[in-house]
């Protein structure tokens, strides 16, 4: 069979780091300095090189795409967006998958590779870690996996505070980018572009506002509105 087993130490990722909090902070950090990243080619190259080296080291030590699952800030961002996808790969009959002993969809077969995303397609119930490559459909000997359409935004269940915070961080960053990059105000733009202007005090203020809005103000506002909605809905 075409197994995707890789070399390395194959250690388990630490459970206490298995939530999205690390990715959330890395994503927020990268976006806070994004104006610098896109205007300084040397810094852009250094960040990309650091990510590649980190991915190689983590892959050599840990198993199951640990870098993508638990460290890569962009993967967390993509996983939230995938919940709004209009298509999904799912079993036709979950009972047949439960009776299957080979699980070729995950481990591979003579006809196709195992899941390159290293999930078990027979147990998929959300899109967050599925890349829709459809390799599992070719691998399944029982033809029990399919791709199907679904209503937009039908998979919006948040399974933890870390996922909820990531969604709120994304909203806060949209507001921040609108003000600093698209708005008519020159002062906030100069704060974010510290390497051109040299206003480090303004940049620190910019970062403080963005982080406070993303981690405190917006979650507090969302929580307050949720409580009001619950109160008035009975």
Tell me the role of every PLM-derived stretch.
Residues 1-98, 119, 137, 143-144, ...:
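Membrane-embedded alpha-helical bundles of multi-pass integral membrane proteins
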Residues 91-140, 144:
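Cysteine-cluster motifs in flexible loop/terminal segments that predominantly coordinate metals
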